[in-house]
């Protein structure tokens, strides 16, 4: 399928945006995942270097990841991911007062999680490349209703300085085309600044698209300011 990302989102493909490596345990905390969620069809968008897909599939589940960076060649992508792990670790250590390090086993534990997640994702990519699809919001190369849940980590709201209200709404509407439920985390920007006006405006616009939204608490977040996630569902969606 031809990927047709909107030009606005091409700005998010540059080197300023981290290709982040996170584990399934971190996703479980951020998105409040439970056993029923993990039995469904999951899309991680953008997947980055997260090992969630690899771990879900290794346990017998069904998950895929979508990210514009997957269009890179294998060695180019590996280099970008490993460089961004170094950059992410350095950034967080430089702002260590903004994080609850005990949640990730201290500075050393946090770095180990990042490197392990990246290694696991890259190993899975080599073994099962069909799980990692090159694509970008707001035009994903996936069929409507091809998943039960879309997870969106550290893109929307995180880069609010580069994405406006319409960008956020268009992205969420597209993810809601793929699955009846979308979970987005965090609701602060990359510096931890709250975005109440943007969040309210997004929710209001989504309602006009017949998408219901609610804000849920996140238990023991690693980033201290990132205490909530946004859950978006089609208004006709019946939760199990």
What are the residue ranges of the model-derived segments?
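Class I S-adenosyl-L-methionine
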Residues: 190-240
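Class I SAM-dependent methyltransferase Rossmann-like catalytic core
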Residues: 2-40, 51, 55-59, 71-82
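Conserved beta-strand signature within the Rossmann-like core of class I S-adenosyl-L-methionine
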Residues: 171, 175-188
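Conserved SAM-binding strand-loop segment of SAM-dependent methyltransferases
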Residues: 128-140
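Class I S-adenosyl-L-methionine-dependent methyltransferase module
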Residues: 58, 62-130
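A short, conserved alpha-helix within the catalytic core of class I
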Residues: 159-174
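A short acidic, Gly/Pro-enriched loop at the edge of an enzyme's catalytic core
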Residues: 138-151
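A conserved beta-strand element that flanks and buttresses the S-adenosyl-L-methionine
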Residues: 151-152, 183
């Amino acid at each position: 399928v031809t990927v047709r990302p909107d030009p606005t989102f091409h700005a998010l493909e540059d080197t300023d945006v981290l290709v982040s490596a996170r584990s399934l345990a971190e996703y479980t905390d951020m998105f409040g995942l439970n056993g029923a969620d993990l039995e469904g069809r999951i899309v991680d968008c953008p997947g980055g270097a997260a090992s969630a897909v690899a771990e879900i599939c290794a346990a017998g589940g069904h998950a895929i990841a979508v990210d514009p960076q997957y269009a890179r060649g294998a060695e180019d992508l590996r280099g970008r991911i490993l460089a961004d792990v170094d950059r992410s670790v350095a950034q967080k250590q430089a702002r260590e007062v903004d994080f609850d390090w005990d949640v990730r086993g201290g500075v050393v534990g946090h770095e180990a999680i990042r490197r392990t997640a990246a290694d696991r994702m890259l190993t899975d990519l080599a073994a099962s490349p069909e799980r990692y699809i090159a694509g970008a919001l707001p035009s994903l190369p996936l069929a409507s209703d091809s998943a039960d849940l879309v997870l969106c980590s550290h893109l929307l709201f995180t880069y609010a300085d580069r994405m406006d209200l319409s960008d956020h709404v268009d992205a969420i509407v597209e993810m809601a085309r793929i699955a009846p439920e979308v979970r987005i985390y965090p609701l602060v920007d990359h510096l931890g600044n709250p975005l109440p006006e943007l969040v309210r405006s997004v929710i209001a616009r989504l309602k006009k698209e017949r998408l219901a939204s609610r804000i849920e608490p996140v238990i023991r977040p690693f980033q201290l300011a990132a205490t909530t996630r946004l859950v978006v569902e089609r208004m006709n969606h019946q939760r199990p």
